[in-house]
Design a protein with these regions (language model features):
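A short alpha/beta connector and helix-capping loop motif
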Residues: 327-344
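Repeated loop/turn-to-beta-strand initiation elements of outer-membrane beta-barrel proteins
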Residues: 72-78, 103-109, 159-165, 172-174, ...
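Post-signal peptide N-terminal segment of secreted/secretory-pathway proteins
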Residues: 80-97
Length: 380
């Protein structure tokens, strides 16, 4: 995306923003709420943080979100539609969700045609990664396009335990890098993006189960959480994979704590490239670029000592990860060995904004230092 395109984007999008949260229409237009009596909301671009994003595939992607809550034979439901357009690749993203929700359960039927990231939990399509991609030319996500339907049932409890079961039918296809604009590129030179991940094209029918458990509410005592994820699919290829992630937060003295994290993953069958385990970047292996390791199985550990001050939290940390060689992932991962890193970090605003300086121990030279700035625990 060129600088001229950026000017066009800003000129066209800024007038859309309406602080009052309303959408102007003519006198003869009647809203869904007026006709049906059902509550409804419509939001554009700047009115929600998930309606404007930036990445190396789409460039800027402004969107709109509309929701209506009609009555039905099974009680009130919410119908939510989202649409956005990548201004660099000119491809639309569409999603329609039908949700029935109670105090503990949520059932959602979805239809979608959209860009997605290989690691949904890392939030690469959210605000934090969009900022670093636009400003610094560092996009940690890897993307592909999926089209299909899904049915999801989720349950949560006051004990901080949750269960999610999802059944899906999806068609996957690769995406090319289309954007070439960053703010840093205006100052220095045109950025060279990381190549996007390859994709095994085809239909995949399957299901997934996520079980999460958290314990410990008092920060003066140990706190922990565990996540178990299972997924299986058939169609273009047949596969199954399982992942386990656990973390423990232990206070040691006043304003100081130790945080430990470990994860393992394995798979059987013909695992698609987009369903492989990939490590690298702030969320899995600091000090290394995303997708430095990848394959059909992995193991990783992380240790951190944090001291709280009035201005934020200062930490010393070390990460380690391993992924064995697998010929199916040639060209998608940069390395196949055990990697380690050490570093220091600063987090401010109750751990919302993080700054990390990490040194990968693969090479003992100053150029092995990597700086990262990112958002964490974003409540959207």
């Amino acid at each position: 995306m060129s600088a001229a395109t950026l000017k066009f984007v800003l000129c066209c999008m800024l007038p859309i923003y309406s602080p009052g949260g309303t959408v102007p229409f003519g006198q003869n237009w009647y809203s869904i709420e007026e006709v049906s009596g059902a509550p409804r909301t419509i939001r554009w671009v700047f009115q929600r943080p998930d309606l404007l994003r930036y990445n190396r595939v789409e460039g800027f992607s402004p969107g709109v979100r509309a929701q209506i809550r009609p009555q039905s034979p099974v009680g009130p439901i919410s119908v939510t539609g989202m649409a956005s357009l990548g201004l660099a690749n000119l491809k639309p993203n569409l999603r329609l969700d039908f949700t029935r929700e109670t105090l503990q359960d949520r059932i959602t039927f979805s239809g979608f045609h959209e860009l997605t990231a290989i690691d949904e939990r890392a939030g690469h399509l959210k605000l934090g990664n969009s900022i670093t991609a636009l400003v610094a030319g560092r996009d940690d996500g890897d993307y592909y396009r999926q089209s299909g339907v899904s049915l999801e049932w989720a349950r949560s409890s006051i004990e901080q335990n949750s269960l999610r079961i999802r059944v899906f039918g999806e068609y996957h296809r690769p995406e090319k890098i289309e954007s070439d604009f960053t703010i840093w590129g205006l100052i220095n030179e045109k950025p060279e993006w990381r190549p996007n991940i390859g994709v095994d094209i085809g239909w995949f029918l399957g299901s997934s189960i996520d079980i999460a458990s958290k314990w410990g509410l008092d920060p003066l005592f140990p706190q922990g959480q565990m996540l178990v994820s299972l997924e299986g699919g058939a169609g273009t290829s047949e596969y199954a994979r399982v992942g386990l992630l656990g973390s423990l937060d232990i206070p040691i003295v006043r304003d100081m704590r130790i945080s430990l994290e470990a994860g393992v993953g394995a798979s059987i069958g013909d695992l698609p490239i987009q369903r492989g385990w990939y490590l690298g970047g702030p969320s899995t292996l600091r000090g290394f670029p995303p997708r430095v390791l990848g394959g059909a199985k992995f193991a990783r550990v992380r240790g951190e000592v944090t001291r709280s001050f009035f201005f934020g939290d200062v930490s010393l940390f070390s990460d380690g990860a391993w992924a064995p060689y697998d010929h199916r992932f040639d060209g998608e991962a940069d390395d196949h060995r055990t990697l380690f890193s050490v570093g220091s970090g600063l987090s401010v605003l109750d751990q919302l904004i993080h700054f990390d300086a990490s040194w990968n121990l693969r090479y003992f030279r100053p150029s092995s230092v990597r700086l990262d700035a990112y958002l964490d625990f974003v409540p959207f």
